[in-house]
């Protein structure tokens, strides 16, 4: 009888990525298969997030539900990971005796050993250390699950924004070596992945070591990943404005695989609030980045994060945020009402914006973003869009579902043999959360790159120095 594993994941794409790696790891090392039913699992793992309000209480509420399962099955192993685990550590075990394992984002690779320790009779295992890049060295080879995939290129953040727990829960910025990233992408491409999303808390801070002891920048990494056979679409998440440098913007000019969509969090349009947040930039500097991006890629669309009701946010501050939203014409946003995160500098500030005012401002902001997004969607009406077919439509399995460059879901009728490939569709209808398309052509009728020899990649970026010596740089 096979052993069963149930993982519940909250939070960001990095947590989703980590959970998929936990599943692969425990399958490879100990033969655990995933189940959606917690009641039939031998191991329950909760991958937590510190970003949302009352994150800790949410964790203990879930553990209370799982305790009843452990009461029925004393051999059940319960583990808590992620950012709340890193933040709370032993306090989780003190409050929830049913928990056997507490691990941080940087120690998930040690899960097989932790589980074995519990099975040998140890009462609790806690490891929330920061062993830097060791995590990636211990993970199994990547497994494709459809035509899109996330690839983590770095961990942590060193920006220390006043509201954010990430530097304390995931550690400071550590980049994966270049060869490791390229190998993982190539392995996924060989399994049929066509779109890769490079992942990290602050990807544009990437500085990966190369085999010859040089450093690869994020801009160089983007070009290298885009040159891998089979990868025809490239995304990345998430960036910080203060390191969104010109060399990254230049990639948008010469790398068509990089999509015309960017998520670049700004958090506020008020310079005063940005200073309080310790963001390291002003609103005008953010707008300068967007202006240069649109010069390089005129059709690029921008999404952002916004925190509403940060301590001291006045009506004028909120008006500045709304002005920035109008000036930049954001296509999408993740917007949240501020709530203090324990241990952050902002937690010491008076939370002086009323809940009612926060809710009103959030509604106003989200309404404006929705209007702007619908305007962009209507502009797509009648156009032909290239989409990557991800699978059957959620609402109608007889139809297909794909995604445009600007992350809009398109439902359309076509043969299911197109799943995993690119198709062109004509947009014929617009809805709030999706588009309707008509099939135009399949991939066999497109002029997509099929094969590119290494010599051709190198020749594209050949440089000769003053002595006539040729160097190849990405």
Curated annotation (Swiss-Prot):
Name the SUPFAM superfamilies for this protein. Answer: Radical SAM enzymes
Under SMART domains, the record lists: Elp3
Q: Name one GO cellular component term.
A: cytosol
Q: How is the cofactor bound?
A: Binds 2 [4Fe-4S] clusters. One cluster is coordinated with 3 cysteines and an exchangeable S-adenosyl-L-methionine.
Cofactor(s) for this protein? [4Fe-4S] cluster
Q: Which reaction does it catalyse?
A: N(6)-dimethylallyladenosine(37) in tRNA + (sulfur carrier)-SH + AH2 + 2 S-adenosyl-L-methionine = 2-methylsulfanyl-N(6)-dimethylallyladenosine(37) in tRNA + (sulfur carrier)-H + 5'-deoxyadenosine + L-methionine + A + S-adenosyl-L-homocysteine + 2 H(+)
Q: Where does the record place the Radical SAM core domain?
A: 143-375
- How would you classify this enzyme at the top EC level? transferase
Annotated [4Fe-4S] cluster 1 binding lies at 12, 49, 83
| Enzyme Commission code | 2.8.4.3
Pfam families according to UniProt: Radical_SAM, TRAM, UPF0004
- Annotated MTTase N-terminal domain residues: 3-120
Annotated Gene Ontology MF terms?
Answer: 4 iron, 4 sulfur cluster binding; metal ion binding; N6-isopentenyladenosine methylthiotransferase activity
Cited CDD domains? Radical_SAM
**Positions of the TRAM domain:** 378-441
NCBIfam families recorded: miaB-methiolase (TIGR01574), MiaB/RimO family radical SAM methylthiotransferase (TIGR00089)
Q: How does it assemble?
A: Monomer.
UniProt family annotation: Belongs to the methylthiotransferase family. MiaB subfamily.
**What is the annotated role of this protein in its UniProt record?**
Catalyzes the methylthiolation of N6-(dimethylallyl)adenosine (i(6)A), leading to the formation of 2-methylthio-N6-(dimethylallyl)adenosine (ms(2)i(6)A) at position 37 in tRNAs that read codons beginning with uridine.
What's this protein's name?
tRNA-2-methylthio-N(6)-dimethylallyladenosine synthase
Q: Native species of this protein? A: Shewanella frigidimarina (strain NCIMB 400)
Q: Which gene encodes it?
A: miaB
